[in-house]
Amino acid sequence: MAEVGSKSVLFVCLGNICRSPIAEAVFRKLVTDEKVSDNWRIDSAATSTYEVGNPPDYRGQNCMRKHGIHMQHIARQITKEDFATFDYILCMDESNLRDLNRKSNQVKNCKAKIELLGSYDPQKQLIIEDPYYGNDSDFEVVYQQCLRCCKAFLEKTY
């Protein structure tokens, strides 16, 4: 569920059960730790309808639990309203970016800046690979990438 705030970010991946809910949970923890959570509206969504209504992948939940981060999300697809109401839409790979740019062209009042979350990575790992067909270590890689990128994004935007 999105929170009220003066800045807003929507994290997006293909199904909204692996990468984007991890990024959402990581960013929520960062803004909470920095005591700026009241200033942010944060959510995540999918470009597809494949997983709508499902909770995050259990491997991602296990990974986040290991790092002391609570994950509470139900997958949803991005809407036209999201493009008009979020300041930033941060996605995980080139396919997401193409889909989002195509969808944004169908929205008259798109205000969102659409970018790859990996563009904020100090280690220059531009793409956050989908761990769905991988193992627990792939989810750890996604967590570490999201942590680096979300920290850098928060520093740049706050």
UniProtKB/Swiss-Prot annotation:
Subunit structure: Interacts with EPHA2; dephosphorylates EPHA2. Interacts with EPHB1.
Function: Acts on tyrosine phosphorylated proteins, low-MW aryl phosphates and natural and synthetic acyl phosphates with differences in substrate specificity between isoform 1 and isoform 2.
Phosphotyrosine found at: 132-133
Listed EC numbers: 3.1.3.48, 3.1.3.2
GO cellular component: cytoplasmic side of plasma membrane; cytosol; sarcolemma
Primary residence: cytoplasm
Protein location: Cytoplasm
Active site annotation, chain numbering: 13 (nucleophile), 19, 130 (proton donor)
Name listed for the protein in its UniProt record: Low molecular weight phosphotyrosine protein phosphatase
Keyword annotations: Acetylation, Cytoplasm, Hydrolase, Phosphoprotein, Protein phosphatase
Gene3D superfamilies: 3.40.50.2300
Tissue: Widely expressed with highest levels in brain and liver and lowest levels in muscle.
Activity modulation comment: Inhibited by sulfhydryl reagents.
Keyword tRNA processing assigned: no
Catalytic activity field: O-phospho-L-tyrosyl-[protein] + H2O = L-tyrosyl-[protein] + phosphate; a phosphate monoester + H2O = an alcohol + phosphate
Enzyme class: hydrolase
UniProt record similarity statement: Belongs to the low molecular weight phosphotyrosine protein phosphatase family.
